[in-house]
Amino acid sequence: MLKINDTFFKSRLFVGTGKYSSNKIMLESIFASESELITLSIRRMDFNNPQNEFLDTLNRSKIKLLPNTSGAKNAKEAVLAAKIAREALNTNWIKLEIHPETKYLLPDSVETLIAAKILVKDGFVVLPYCFPDPVICHKLVDVGCSAVMPLGSPIGTNLGLINDYFLKIIIEQINIPIIIDAGIGSPSHAVKAIEIGADAVLVNTAIATSNNPVKMAKSFKIALQAAEIAKNSGLSGKSFISHRSSPLTDFLNY
């Protein structure tokens, strides 16, 4: 099982809540994924609506909510969003996202580190979205983050793990959970993330914008279950030369 802070997760699949055509499809997809943690944007939530079916349904389930600070352009805005989320959702878990430019939504490492320090000191369980940069990941560990969430590729691109070399360094060196976030575009991308040693993946666009989000969510669930079983079974090493599986003898000994 995966442990983040004081919480255990059976599923290695975390899912987002954006881009769905309706709340109904979103909820069906979340339940089909069997994810135990979902992330949601503070900016999109109507906390004053007592008829918020989405939040009511999730609060009745055992799924953990991970509010995010998406849209924050600096540390000050991110800290404010985190405090609003804590008050509104009664959780000290926060996915820290700071991306000041809007075309590629790349994380601001400097502001992320500043905000992480403040939030950890204020009692938050901080999971920062960050570059696949081993140096910044080490710094985020040092300030007390509970996991790191390096991007596979830019948000919403579905390009997969375009920086897997650096991801492998992070996986080798970092001793807290590593969740590959952003760019996971297919179940095979998610499988690769687990096979190289990541602890979990966060998927949104690939599920929400597919032709059938419910079936796609289920396919990610099955793929990650298979990936975890394979990893725990001990994947066979790779080789650039052939290794015969049968004895090399004279054919039929004629």
From Swiss-Prot:
It catalyses: [ThiS sulfur-carrier protein]-C-terminal-Gly-aminoethanethioate + 2-iminoacetate + 1-deoxy-D-xylulose 5-phosphate = [ThiS sulfur-carrier protein]-C-terminal Gly-Gly + 2-[(2R,5Z)-2-carboxy-4-methylthiazol-5(2H)-ylidene]ethyl phosphate + 2 H2O + H(+). Its main location: cytoplasm. It is found in: Cytoplasm. Pathway: Cofactor biosynthesis; thiamine diphosphate biosynthesis. The active site is at K95 (schiff-base intermediate with dxp). Keywords: Cytoplasm, Schiff base, Thiamine biosynthesis, Transferase. PANTHER family: THIAZOLE SYNTHASE (PTHR34266:SF2). One of its GO terms (cellular component) is cytoplasm. Homotetramer. Forms heterodimers with either ThiH or ThiS. This is Thiazole synthase. Pfam families: ThiG. One of its GO terms (biological process) is thiamine diphosphate biosynthetic process. Catalyzes the rearrangement of 1-deoxy-D-xylulose 5-phosphate (DXP) to produce the thiazole phosphate moiety of thiamine. Sulfur is provided by the thiocarboxylate moiety of the carrier protein ThiS. In vitro, sulfur can be provided by H(2)S. Belongs to the ThiG family. InterPro entries: Aldolase_TIM (IPR013785), Thiazole_synthase_ThiG (IPR033983), ThiG (IPR008867). Its EC number is 2.8.1.10. 1-deoxy-D-xylulose 5-phosphate binds at G156, A182, G183, N204, T205. GO terms for molecular function: thiazole synthase activity.
